[in-house]
Amino acid sequence: KASGIKSRYVMNKSGVIDPERMFPVIPERSNDEIGIQAEIGVAAAIDALKRAGKTAADVDGIIVACSNMQRAYPAVAIEIQQALGAGGYAYDMNVACSSATFGLQAAADAVRGGSARCVLVISPEITSAHLEWRDRDCHFIFGDVATAIVVELAETCTSTDAFEIIGTRLHTQFSSAIRNNFGFLNRCDESGVNTRDKLFKQEGRKVFKEVCRMVDEQIISNSNDCGLAVSDLKRLWLHQANLSMNELIAKRVLGREFNRDDAPVILDEFANTSSAGSIIAFHRHRDDLASGEIGVICSFGAGYSIGSVLVRRC
């Protein structure tokens, strides 16, 4: 009940609900086939480009920003670049659940600095594959999804559904309270292969207590540094991890009782989709904002990491 999660989407259901298996069935593909993570990333990218009135030829930067990559190299972003037929450069970024907002700042910096004119930030999250489905503390939490956002120069923007990035703020602080020790060094010590720590694991209560305070402080300071009061924020598109967590953050930031219009919830349908959650909330709950109204996209998670992006409806 406290989580707010009622359903979720996964890449493969049969493997997850098989009591003898309890992890998804995702067949390995040959090197001549597009990878599963790139495939869902391409689908999200095509949709985002269509909504922005752009084509792949307009794109000169791609950032795949998500909590886990299916391989070390070549970068999933470069695979997507080839599949789309885009130019420029592409790279992968992992800042766990904050990856999308960190990617948005990197994209905005690239556009402002002149190293790119149009950047795709793509978050293909297959969380079901790095989750321990036998662990009652986390098995119900996550879902799979892919999102994409187009970041471009104002003078090239032709979309009637655009938002201006007016301020970003990133913060990290080391903690092992959310951790996944899977990596290429695991095979160098056979005693640790496939042990519990090689999948997502968290100390939920500790995370709740420590992260909420950090998040509301960051949103308020980011707003103030941009010359805004929290009363100027029409909407909080928060990381979709836990309903109680978001309710507490929203109440602290806004300094009042709030409703779901102030801080929309999508985790009841999608569950925790890691870095993609705040982007889905933004996608689904932005249409009613009038020109000039402001909101903040904020994600937070392992690291600890927090990213907040202030946006204004054009």
Indicate residue ranges for each PLM-predicted region.
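Glycine-rich beta-alpha junction loops
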Residues: 126, 154-155, 169-175, 239-242, ...
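Conserved beta-ketoacyl condensing-enzyme motif
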Residues: 9, 14-95, 225-246
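Short acidic, glycine/serine/threonine-rich loops at helix termini
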Residues: 73-76, 104-105, 130-136, 177-178, ...
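Claisen-condensing/thiolase-fold acyl-transfer catalytic domains that form or cleave C-C bonds
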Residues: 32, 38, 42, 68-69, ...
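Buried hydrophobic positions in well-ordered alpha/beta secondary-structure cores of metabolic enzymes
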Residues: 48, 59-62, 103, 150, ...
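Flexible, glycine-rich active-site loops centered on histidine and acidic residues
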Residues: 114-145
